[in-house]
Amino acid sequence: MDKVLNREESMELMDLLGLDRSAWGNIPVMRKAYLKKCKELHPDKGGDEDKMKRMNFLYKKMEQGVKVAHQPDFGTWNSSEVPTYGTDEWESWWNTFNEKWDEDLFCHEEMFASDDENTGSQHSTPPKKKKKVEDPKDFPVDLHAFLSQAVFSNRTVASFAVYTTKEKAQILYKKLMEKYSVTFISRHGFGGHNILFFLTPHRHRVSAINNYCQKLCTFSFLICKGVNKEYLFYSALCRQPYAVVEESIQGGLKEHDFNPEEPEETKQVSWKLVTQYALETKCEDVFLLMGMYLDFQENPQQCKKCEKKDQPNHFNHHEKHYYNAQIFADSKNQKSICQQAVDTVAAKQRVDSIHMTREEMLVERFNFLLDKMDLIFGAHGNAVLEQYMAGVAWIHCLLPQMDTVIYDFLKCIVLNIPKKRYWLFKGPIDSGKTTLAAALLDLCGGKSLNVNMPLERLNFELGVGIDQFMVVFEDVKGTGAESRDLPSGHGISNLDCLRDYLDGSVKVNLERKHQNKRTQVFPPGIVTMNEYSVPRTLQARFVRQIDFRPKAYLRKSLSCSEYLLEKRILQSGMTLLLLLIWFRPVADFAAAIHERIVQWKERLDLEISMYTFSTMKANVGMGRPILDFPREEDSEAEDSGHGSSTESQSQCFSQVSEASGADTQENCTFHICKGFQCFKKPKTPPPK
């Protein structure tokens, strides 16, 4: 090995390998150190390119020399090459052979006797070996409260602590300062080791800091952790038993460095208020709720909608939600807030459908309609009660004993008896079946479904009926073989495949998009269709069928009273509720709303007299504008069925009819078509 490299080259190679000079010639150790240094000094790893080249040159030269030294003929000679001893040739050969060894054979060193050699004896006990001090496994216990104990975490922090040896801490102090451009770094002594504390301008993972430091601590121990309480940790390192060795900022850190000025309190949207508004208005549309709530950000004192007072869902809640709506307008998660509110409405419906009886649910719906009537017909409302009573008169002429029809339907829907839950409205175009079905749907609350689509696409449409009080299968189409004017569709065929849904005997699976399936009894309801042929298997599912016929006087009267269509009075549940209040006795209503029904009967007696309503029906029968009559009050107030009386307005009509039954039909001023009750046009009372 002494001939492989000269002394300067061998010392340089050992320094580059990071090995002690005594390891020269230990090829396995040098090989391991060489591979390790290749990873550190490689330019792709951030190392020194010049050192890498020099180390490769010396190591390759050393390897080549070792191979030559291990060859069989290295250092040997042939006996025939040696001249005869004693001759001049032999002297010359001998000098040449020894000239390379002369400098290595001389050693200019003086040996001094040690104390152990002078005092020790031949039989003395050898000295004990020094015990190896174990490296620490963790930070000192008193610092644990300030450090993060997470081992495998992707959380990033900006303050770190490194626990290592004194020698490595000196190196890491400078390396970390350059590598991460630290805001602050300090080195503290503890026993024979050091603790580094530093703050970085950017956040890093603890594992990234640890991996970088491990490259510089091959044999030395290293513990790296994130710091949760920076100032408390730093102040602890500045007290005994720790000592400050050096720090990047003169005077160190102060407590106020970690206490920034308190920012202004961030205003946050009250999700609870938005949810409360959605529950009060029973809003199930995310975008509708978002739009209505954004309208609240305008000042209530300058709001035109509040001045008109035509939208109860707005002016009744504007002032309460004004402040929260201003914050809501600046929020970035408006849709998430509204989606949660709508989900809460659906959750409320789910709870009500499970815990409330159907009678209680209908009473709650009636209370909702009565509240709405109090608003729109109140002092701040803009609805005209007389126009809604005109709608009552028109609907009452649609079918004989309309109040009884509606009452029987409500009874059927509330009882919800299996196989006796669905009504069929059948008739030609423009006969009024859809108008009545829509009004009943609004009266009870529910959804309208379209089944005129392929059966495989019907699942999500049926899922609309989840947690609903009733449904309406609107305008169901058949084969169209009955008439060329009737279009064909899948409706009747699909309903025939949904017998379990119509019967209500067993629970069925309903599903919506992005929701789990819901198992429940499908809600009862109404089926409307034109004059299609209904199979016997489907006809057996209807407890009652009503055949509608178009009437010219109804169409003519409706065309003269456009407000009924413009304001959708005929399709409103409030119109049917007013019809029930006018015709049915108080005893037919639930006891929970008797007081409110009595109040409305009294109001109708004051504003709409029997004479006025009879004139409205007369105008309907003659195809005239319903409200085209002189506004004159009757001389006597007439009972509407509240208080001690159990009679209703329909009973009053029947008494009038019986009293005038002796008169012939020809003597009547007008006559409503066959099937309806005939009555005389009331005489105009004399002027007061």
UniProtKB/Swiss-Prot annotation:
InterPro entries: DnaJ_domain, Helicase_SF3_DNA-vir, J_dom_sf, Lg_T_Ag_polyomavir, Lg_T_Ag_Polyomavir_C, P-loop_NTPase, T_Ag_DNA-bd, Znf_lg_T-Ag_D1-typ. It holds the Pfam family T_Ag_DNA_bind. The modification N-acetylmethionine is found at residue 1. Its cofactor is Mg(2+). DNA helicase activity requires Mg(2+). Gene3D superfamilies: 3.40.1310.20, DnaJ domain (1.10.287.110), Large T antigen, SV40, domain 3 (1.20.1050.70), P-loop containing nucleotide triphosphate hydrolases (3.40.50.300), Zinc finger, large T-antigen D1 domain (1.10.10.510). A motif (LXCXE motif) lies at residues 105-109. The J domain is essential for multiple viral activities, including virion assembly, viral DNA replication, transformation and transcriptional activation. This is Large T antigen.
